[in-house]
Regions:
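Extended recognition patches within non-cytosolic domains
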Residues: 2-23, 30, 123-127, 156-241, ...
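Short surface loop/edge beta-strand patches of beta-sandwich-type extracellular domains
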Residues: 29-46, 89-97, 146-149, 184-191, ...
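Extracellular glycan-recognition modules
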Residues: 29-81, 113, 166-171, 280-281, ...
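Short hydrophobic/aromatic patches on beta-strands that form ligand-binding or substrate-lining surfaces
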Residues: 48-56, 105-107, 157-162, 200-201, ...
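Extracellular glycan-interaction patches encoded by glycine-rich segments
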Residues: 85-87, 136-157
Length: 433
């Protein structure tokens, strides 16, 4: 079970049989994940391509790709940094800090130097060459430093390719959709990878490091899980079907996010909250939250016209509805008797029907009752009454624990309605006369 609905053509590249990325690999920094291989190739000419989605916004730099002492990283200020041991570091001007979006990274190296692209835009050019063979049999890592986990990347990765012997442009790996203007992935199966090239798709649960280039240049993986449940790191959140996450840019108070921005720990005596990245104003939608530590936590939906808070979030008027074991908090009226209490380990289903303006909460697949709400645009949300709580969310990027109610969909881009205007820039271009 994936998107629980027919994908929107808008997110299928606007053309027939558009290529779909099946899986991503979640990189949860605290787990010390590792993805690497030892091998040789043409150190003077090669191309690396991959897609990434940010997780926690760390203040230390994060490794994207490294071999020996040369590396491509996200700096502590969110700029890209290409580091050459002999010639120093080179930085992008732009900063990459949107945890809700997928970025396409391409690094092309030839005898003239190194070029780094993001979403088909050049961001770093250097006469220095990224050296894959600084030492014999150099180890190359994706998203992990060679030694400690301190500088590991945190987030998601997909479609990892290395082309041995060619310096390619981003158009070899992705293209501009003619209807939407989006930069979207291509099918890489027809590329010539070179004898030491590789293509990682993360679709084989028995071998996450499997090379699909035909070269059998498999990667070693460590500290990733494919077990069913919240710890599964093989997910359906991809560049062709972006899923809702808890947004680290839309929070207040003491909130710590991890596991691809799907797990939240809320601490402290002050009111805290974090909001999901998808807002919906029509249709029927469903997500689940595992109550890891119930504490003082609430889960539910928040209407996005709430721009400020004066006191605890669940006390606001006309815009929020939360379920806390045995109680319902709605529109500023707290502590209404609702449903049964829940304990650590229970799974809370949160269904919102914006066609009829209703919300239903479930405890371990048992309906706790349907409640009316006001119309508006709602986002998933969790908050606290001043204490602590821990929840793990699932917006559909892995299989739900329980089948959603009939007609309810996961919060992902494939399920969103088609936009009214395609290629909006064509309607807002500046005209001179």
């Amino acid at each position: 079970m994936s998107s629980l609905g027919s994908p929107s053509p808008f997110f299928l590249a606007g053309k027939e049989k558009a290529f779909q990325v099946e899986r991503s690999l979640r990189i949860n920094k605290p787990d010390n994940p590792q993805l690497y291989r030892t091998g040789s190739n043409n150190a003077n000419t090669f191309t690396v391509s991959f897609w990434m989605k940010l997780g926690r916004l760390y203040t230390s730099y994060r490794v994207l790709f490294a071999s020996y002492s040369d590396g491509l990283t996200l700096n502590n200020d969110h700029r890209l940094r290409f580091n050459d041991e002999g010639d120093g570091s080179f930085y992008s001007t732009a900063k990459f800090r949107d945890p809700t979006a997928w970025y396409h990274i391409v690094m092309a190296v030839n005898t003239s130097g190194t070029t780094v692209y993001v979403n088909n835009v050049t961001h770093i050019t250097s006469s220095s060459k990224f050296n894959l063979s600084s030492v014999s049999g150099a180890i190359r890592h994706f998203w992990q430093a060679g030694d400690p986990a301190e500088f590991a990347f945190d987030g998601y990765g997909a479609e990892v390719a290395l082309i041995d012997g060619q310096a390619l442009t981003p158009s070899s790996f992705a293209e501009t959709d003619p209807l939407t203007g989006q930069w979207i992935p291509k099918d890489l199966s027809e590329l010539t990878f070179g004898s030491n090239g590789h293509y990682l798709k993360f679709t084989d649960s028995t071998n996450l490091g499997k090379d699909f280039s035909g070269n059998n240049n498999n990667f070693t993986v460590a500290n990733f899980s494919v077990a069913a449940g919240a710890g599964n790191d093989s997910l359906e959140d991809t560049p062709t079907n972006n899923f809702c996450i808890l947004n680290p840019l839309d929070k207040m108070g003491t909130v710590t996010l991890s596991e691809g921005n799907l797990k939240v720990v809320i601490n402290g005596d002050n009111a805290s909250l974090v909001t999901g990245s998808f807002g919906v104003s029509s249709g029927k939608w469903y997500y689940e939250a595992v109550a890891d530590t119930v504490g003082e936590g609430f889960v539910g939906w928040i209407r996005k016209d709430v721009s400020s808070y004066t006191g605890y979030p669940y006390q606001q008027n006309g815009s929020l509805i939360f379920y806390r074991g045995g109680s319902l908090y709605k529109d500023g009226a707290g502590g209404q008797s609702y449903g049964s209490s829940y304990v650590n380990g229970d799974i809370i289903g949160c269904a919102i029907n914006l066609d009829d303006n209703e919300v239903t909460f479930y405890k371990n697949n048992s309906s706790q009752g349907t409640v009316s709400i006001t119309a508006g645009t709602y986002n998933p949300n969790t908050t606290t009454g001043g204490g602590s709580a821990t929840y793990t969310f699932n917006f559909g990027q892995r299989a739900f624990s329980y089948t959603p109610p009939t007609g309810f969909k996961a919060l992902c881009s494939a399920n969103l309605p088609d936009p009214t205007i395609l290629l909006p820039n064509k309607h807002f271009d500046t005209l001179l006369w």
